[in-house]
Amino acid sequence: MNKRLILIGLCLMLFCRISLAQQVLSYATDVTRSLDMTKGQTTKGISKTGLPEIQINSSIRYQEIDGFGAAITGSTAYNLSLMPAEARHTFLEETFSPDKYGFSYVRVSIGCSDFSLSEYTLCDEPGIEHFGLTIEETKYVIPALKEILSINPALKIMGTPWTCPKWMKVKSLDEPVPYDSWTGGQLNPACYEDYAHYFVLWIQAMQQAGVPIYCVTPQNEPLNRGNSASLFMGWKEQQAFVKQALGPAFRKADLAVKIYAFDHNYNYDNMPDQRQYPLHIYEDADAARFFAGAAYHNYGGSPSELLLIQREAPDKELVFSEASIGTWNNGRDLEKSLLRDVEQLGLATVNGWCRGSIVWNLMLDNDRGPHRGEGACATCYGVVDIDNTDYTTITRNSHFYAMAHMSVAAKPGAYRIATNEEAVDGLAYAAFINPDGSYGLVVSNRGEAQQVNISLNGNAAFVAELPAKAVVSYSWK
């Protein structure tokens, strides 16, 4: 009798494995929220006549994928700290666990940002010997990052300064007088070595706290003089700073931390002498060798700029490092924002050769805060908003779905693979092969509900059931 039960159990296990292997797993979200990362299954290996077709070719590989995620700003970390511990861990696990939505890339500020609890750097007193982490890092940001790392140890972290210490600033390179302001100014070339050491000390301090840093950018929005905490840094300055100081400092300290250039808008803030900012930097081979690639934001211009930069510098990487939602672009209204943001921040970036995409604040409260004063964004929403009357109730906004749908289909270490050169009408999509050999596909459908054949290397893969005005992520082996 026992042998028979064991045999039946083994047969059931084998049947379940075979059944699962024959299934395509999916997550779907539509603009009405009636589908909200709703899981489904589709049978593999079938097709229907007369349907449009998405053709996938896994023999053609493009860039490797580092991941998708959001910024852990001071404001985000503060809001997380106010949540009950169990509720916070549940949210972070659902968001970052590789077995769930799998966010895997975050961005943090080096010193303050416009979403910090105060304006500060890590060395406000003149003299680099006064460097030190502040309460914003030790009480809020680092504990949040360590909790996320306990959930997803492979998390990649990008660090970016909004401003250098004020004692390192001059009004301009043409008028090199001291500049005692958080907003604007330029880095004094006499402080290049101190500022490079500032980066090294920050990376080492974070590592000592259990937070490894994957990459940095030399300056957030270097062409924006008016942000709450900012520093103007044209391409000539960034080229010189990294070539003369930052790159050599990383090598001397034996830091295997990538440096990404630029970190600003597709349209270079309409400054003619700054267009194609990274390409100018790469023209100097001694500077270019220190740069892994370039980072971009989308507050101006078109993601088609990514294709231009990749075409001219195919040996350099690209990453998308910031976008925000708010009252101006209806980020809480999925009717207006869901498909737009999936297509612009997920699909257009990876199809434009980006290795990853990071959006702005992971969590703000329902009053869009906390945030800084003059020059800061008082109208931004978080990837999610938390109700500040209970610090438990969470509302997902469009950026959450954009990053979640990409993350469940394309795991870190995946490669983007080829799809139809001519897109199917009304659809936007991207396909991937993951490190475990599974495939991922993200499809945005702007039209009515429809069926689409999916083929892989010339063979029927499955029939995709696309709800109206929805995004669906698929994964299968």
Please report, for each region that a protein language model flagged, where it lies by residue.
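Active-site neighborhood of glycoside hydrolase catalytic domains
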Residues: 194-215, 222-328
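C-terminal beta-strand-rich structural cap/linker in extracellular carbohydrate-active enzymes
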Residues: 465-477
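Carbohydrate-binding surface patches
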Residues: 408, 419-457, 469
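Conserved, mostly hydrophobic/aromatic
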Residues: 70, 102, 157, 216, ...
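Loop/turn elements at helix/coil->beta-strand transitions in domains of secreted/extracellular proteins
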Residues: 66-67, 99-106, 152-156, 209-215, ...
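Bacterial Sec-dependent N-terminal signal peptides
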Residues: 1-23
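N-terminal catalytic cores of secreted or lumenal carbohydrate-active enzymes
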Residues: 35-213, 234, 244
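Aromatic/acidic polysaccharide-binding cleft in carbohydrate-active enzymes
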Residues: 317-402, 417-420
